[in-house]
């Protein structure tokens, strides 16, 4: 166990390890407003949840770092934690790690190995709130009024819909980020259109996670070289509306109504 894992007493770490971090993660998500996520062993990414094997529950942010009772981990480090757990529980199942995000209500209904309990969640909350050194690891959410599981939904795939709804409700342009080069870690990502944002006059960009330096959003996707285009956003938006009108309209209405309610 390395030094960054000693934010909490060992008996607590051992208990949270045995229950896959579920109570700790829910407690941390309640405190911070960040994203509840479960890592599963899955034969394929969209495998039914009843066929996947749960591994660990953690909290994510708008970046790629992961937080659980052991502290802050990058993706590569966290995978080294998950792989031995997957090997132990596989029972002959072949596959890889599938990371899925959930609301708290959804998480309570999942077929997890260990079910969360309110008493242990409250105990974890009390412990976390006493650990300033741990809480300092975690960034503050810019716009906690948007539930994290919804923000995650509008981060990938539906980012265009969010940007369009934000544009329609204001005066700023929706702009596509077109990628010509990724970092090595993201080198398998598709070149071309990647994400849509609202560009502000001060040069900052806004997506579902809030207004922030564009560089922060680029880092999330591992973008090195890129260009910006309002025309490309319009093209992608129209393509989505044309190809999947029911899905598009449902997604648009959902976020548009939420934005109106919090404006």
Each PLM stretch: what is its role?
Residues 1-263:
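A structural boundary/capping signal
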């Amino acid at each position: 166990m390395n030094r960054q894992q000693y934010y909490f007493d060992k008996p607590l770490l051992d208990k949270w390890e045995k229950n896959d971090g579920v109570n700790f993660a829910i407690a941390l998500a309640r405190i911070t407003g960040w994203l509840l996520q479960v890592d599963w062993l899955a034969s394929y990414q969209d495998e039914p949840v009843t066929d996947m094997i749960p591994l660990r529950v953690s909290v994510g942010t708008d970046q790629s770092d992961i937080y659980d009772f052991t502290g802050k981990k990058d993706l590569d480090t966290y995978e080294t934690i998950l792989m031995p757990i997957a090997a132990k529980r596989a029972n002959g199942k072949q596959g890889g790690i599938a990371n899925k995000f959930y609301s708290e209500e959804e998480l309570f209904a999942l077929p997890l190995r260990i079910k969360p309990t309110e008493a242990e969640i409250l105990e974890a909350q009390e412990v976390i709130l006493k650990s300033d050194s741990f809480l300092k690891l975690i960034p503050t959410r810019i716009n906690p009024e948007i539930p994290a599981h919804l923000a995650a939904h509008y981060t990938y795939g539906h980012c265009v819909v969010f940007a369009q709804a934000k544009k329609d409700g204001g005066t700023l342009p929706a702009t596509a980020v077109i990628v010509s080069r990724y970092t090595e870690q993201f080198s398998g990502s598709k070149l071309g259109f990647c994400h849509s944002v609202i560009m502000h006059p001060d040069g900052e960009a806004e997506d579902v996670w809030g207004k922030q330096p564009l560089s922060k959003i680029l880092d999330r996707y591992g973008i090195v070289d890129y260009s910006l285009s309002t025309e490309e956003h319009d093209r992608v938006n129209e393509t989505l509306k044309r190809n999947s009108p029911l899905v598009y309209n449902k997604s648009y209405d959902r976020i548009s109504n939420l934005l109106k309610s919090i404006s």
